[in-house]
Regions:
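Hydrophobic alpha-helical connector segments
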Residues: 9, 72-104
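Amphipathic alpha-helical segments used for helix-helix packing
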Residues: 97-118, 122
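Short, amphipathic alpha-helix enriched in basic
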Residues: 2, 7-44, 53-64
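Long, charge-rich low-complexity segments
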Residues: 189-209
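All-alpha amphipathic helical-bundle segments outside canonical DNA-binding/catalytic cores
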Residues: 139-152, 170-173
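Amphipathic C-terminal alpha-helical segment
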Residues: 155-168, 183-191
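C-terminal ligand-sensing/allosteric alpha-helical core of TetR-family HTH transcriptional regulators
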Residues: 83-97, 123, 127-134, 180
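Amphipathic alpha-helical packing segments from all-alpha helical-bundle domains
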Residues: 115-137, 148-152
Length: 209
C-alpha cells in the first residue's frame, strides 16, 4: 500500500468513527457526509476522494469497519471458548457493543430499501463468514454455505429483536441469541444424520463417470 493509500485508510476510519455517532441524528445522505467531514476537519466534499465509488462504498466500508471493531473486542475473550460460545460472543459484540441502537435502526432501514437489498445481503453474509472464521470453522464444502446460511438467519432476526429490547443490559437479546443458536445447532445435528446422495448414487450422473 502506498503512503497515500495508508493515509486514506486512516482518514476513512476517522470518517466511520464519526458516522457511528452522527447516524443517531441524521439519515444516510449528503447532510450526513457533510457533517462527518466537519467533525473530521476535512475539506468540503473530501469524502468524494476517500470514496470514489460513491454511497455503496461508504455503506459497505462502514459495515466492514464495524466487523473490524467486533474482531478487536473478541481478541479480549478467552481463547479456549467452545465454538457455540465464540459465536454467541461475536453476535453479542457485533449487535450490541459497536454502535448505538439508533444506528442499527438506520442501517436496517437502509438495507430494506429495494435498491440496497443486495448490498445488505452482501454485508450481512460477510459478517457471518467472519464470525464462523473467528469460531475456527475451516469447512470448504456444502457445510460452508449451510453454516453461514443458518447463522445469517440468526444474525438478522437478532438485530431486529434488539431494536425492541428495553431490558436491562439487553439481557433479552442475549437470551434470544442463545436460544436461536441452540435451534440451529439442533438443525445441524439432524443434517449430519442425513446421508446426502453421492454422484455414484444418481443414475444420470453415474453414466458420466
Amino acid at each position: 500500500m502506498t503512503d497515500i493509500g495508508k493515509k486514506h485508510k486512516l482518514l476513512r476510519e476517522e470518517f466511520f468513527n464519526q458516522l457511528a455517532f452522527l447516524l443517531s441524528e441524521l439519515e444516510w445522505g449528503k447532510d450526513l457526509y457533510k457533517k462527518a467531514e466537519e467533525k473530521c476537519n476535512f475539506s468540503e466534499n473530501y469524502h468524494y476522494i476517500l470514496f470514489s465509488e460513491g454511497d455503496a462504498q461508504i455503506i459497505e466500508g462502514f459495515e466492514e469497519w464495524q466487523d473490524q471493531k467486533m474482531l478487536e473486542l473478541l481478541i479480549k475473550e478467552e481463547p479456549k471458548l467452545k465454538i457455540r460460545e465464540k459465536i454467541f460472543k461475536a453476535l453479542e459484540a457485533r449487535i450490541i457493543s459497536i454502535v448505538p441502537k439508533s444506528v442499527i435502526l438506520q442501517q436496517n432501514a437502509l438495507f430494506l430499501s429495494p435498491c440496497n437489498l443486495f448490498l445488505g445481503a452482501k454485508c450481512y453474509s460477510r459478517t457471518c463468514d467472519l464470525i464462523w472464521r473467528y469460531a475456527g470453522d475451516k469447512s470448504d464444502d456444502f457445510n460452508y454455505y449451510s453454516k453461514r446460511g443458518l447463522l445469517l438467519g440468526v444474525y438478522i432476526s437478532a438485530r431486529l429483536f434488539y431494536l425492541s429490547d428495553d431490558s436491562k443490559e439487553f439481557i433479552k437479546t442475549k437470551e434470544f441469541i442463545a436460544t436461536s443458536l441452540e435451534s440451529i445447532i439442533k438443525v445441524a445435528k439432524i443434517k449430519t444424520k442425513i446421508k446426502l446422495p453421492s454422484i455414484e448414487d444418481i443414475p444420470i450422473l453415474r453414466l458420466m463417470l
